[in-house]
């Protein structure tokens, strides 16, 4: 165990002046693209601060990027874990009060003694990462290009409490399907950004970064990358952000795939009442379940800064806050017999949690709930005239009847899955990938 002689207090950021930053703990990296290789050769001869200056000076610049967490930051994490003070738990209780104590103890012990961040860092760095600045905000993204010239550009958008690590099992098969038992016709150029305030992207310094504004930023990113038309996929906030993209720029989109469909009641009674019996049972069951799951939304939607002081300073608190969502929103028994280790490995969970910890973005990421609640969209939603496909996983948080989705979207594809939950790309990557491929095969024809 590595120890530090002193521990600095980690405090969540507050909204302040403009920020253009690559973050002190990260470095630029090489890429297969010849121009990127040349850029890397130049960048390695100058300090990080000058690379930051290059981004700030050239509004259209895109620099290769690599994740490289400093040893002292990892040591600080282990020291904090060593000093963890845990609460008690009621006898006979499990997850119904929140994160189960014995599970958290095991997770924290693994994080402190056995979790190999460098291995996970290397896994993530196997993808092609970049950084650019859009509207004075540094934006990190993976851009995994396919060798197939006919590949569809796919903007793959995560949510909360996720990150780009959610997509680590599907980016390779999407960009290079032939290397993963697929066919070249299913190729995608994958663009997977860290949302503003999440992970390796910059933190908004002014109020107002709601999902619509994020969508407009991502539209600018796709323009900067030279994609005139592209496709969308994602869940959670990613689904909502993509909804805004489709609402603003339907002419730019090839198609929209979602694993969290959202639609209100149609005005037409014939559509509103067109609910299959099995749909009604599932919708009601998920609504009942969500009544016990929305407490976090009330906190993050009203006082995210107050919550942040605890989570930014305690890795145990951060892990408990995030892992409870992975337990509650996944397809497993929610009682004492449910085993989260059978759904996600500890490495998968801790890679995502570590990204939040190392970047100190738990507070900035939760503000999206506040901004969504308090900053109305500038363009009301109408019918989404973009070919849309939906993957309906049984443990998804929100469910709508198919007829309601058809009233709101140009619905071309609807798959009801036998298993899986909210974090579909990580929990059921084979099913998720197959459904994305099947939907876009319809549009390629």
Task: Label each PLM-derived region with a short phrase.
Residues 11-38:
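Primarily auto-inhibitory N-terminal propeptides
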Residues 117-119, 195-209, 243:
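Glycine-rich "HGGG/HGxG" loop immediately N-terminal to the catalytic nucleophile
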Residues 174-200:
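Conserved alpha/beta-hydrolase
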């Amino acid at each position: 165990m590595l120890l530090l002689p002193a521990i600095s207090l980690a405090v969540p950021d507050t909204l302040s002046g403009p920020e253009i930053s690559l973050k002190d703990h990260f470095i630029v990296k090489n890429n297969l693209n010849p121009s990127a290789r040349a850029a890397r050769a130049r960048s390695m001869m100058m300090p990080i601060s000058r690379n930051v200056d290059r981004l700030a000076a050239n509004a259209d610049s895109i620099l290769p990027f690599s994740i490289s967490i400093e040893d002292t930051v990892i040591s600080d994490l282990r020291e904090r874990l060593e000093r963890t003070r845990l609460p008690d738990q009621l006898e006979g209780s499990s997850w119904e009060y929140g994160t189960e104590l014995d599970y958290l103890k095991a997770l924290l012990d693994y994080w402190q003694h056995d979790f190999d961040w460098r291995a996970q860092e290397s896994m993530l760095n196997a993808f092609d990462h970049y950084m650019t600045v859009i509207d004075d905000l540094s934006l990190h993204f993976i851009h995994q290009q396919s060798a197939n010239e006919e590949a569809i550009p796919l903007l793959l958008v995560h949510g909360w409490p996720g990150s780009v690590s959610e997509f680590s099992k599907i980016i390779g098969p999407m960009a290079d399907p032939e290397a993963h038992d697929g066919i070249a016709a299913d190729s995608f150029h994958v663009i997977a950004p860290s949302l503003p305030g999440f992970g390796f992207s910059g933190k908004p310094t002014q109020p107002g970064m709601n999902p619509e504004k994020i969508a407009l930023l991502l539209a600018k990113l796709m323009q900067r990358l030279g994609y005139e038309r592209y496709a969308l996929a994602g869940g959670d906030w990613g689904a909502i952000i993509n909804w805004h993209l489709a609402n603003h720029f339907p002419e730019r989109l090839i198609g929209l795939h979602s694993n969290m469909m959202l639609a209100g009641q149609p005005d037409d009674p014939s559509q509103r009442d067109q609910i299959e019996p099995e749909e009604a049972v599932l919708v009601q069951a998920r609504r009942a379940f969500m009544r016990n799951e929305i407490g976090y939304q009330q906190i993050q939607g009203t006082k995210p800064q107050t919550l942040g002081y605890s989570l930014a300073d305690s890795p145990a608190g951060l892990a408990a806050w995030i892992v409870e969502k992975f337990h509650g929103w996944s397809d497993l028994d929610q009682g004492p017999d449910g085993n989260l280790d059978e759904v996600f490995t500890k490495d998968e969970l801790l890679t995502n949690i570590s990204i939040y910890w190392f970047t100190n973005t738990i507070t900035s990421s939760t503000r999206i709930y506040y901004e969504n609640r308090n900053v109305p969209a500038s363009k009301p939603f109408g019918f989404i005239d973009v070919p849309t496909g939906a993957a309906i996983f049984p443990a998804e948080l929100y469910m709508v009847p198919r007829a309601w989705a058809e009233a709101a979207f140009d619905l071309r594809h609807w798959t009801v899955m036998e298993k899986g939950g909210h974090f579909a790309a990580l929990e059921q990557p084979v099913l998720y990938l197959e459904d994305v491929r099947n939907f876009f095969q319809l549009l390629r024809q």
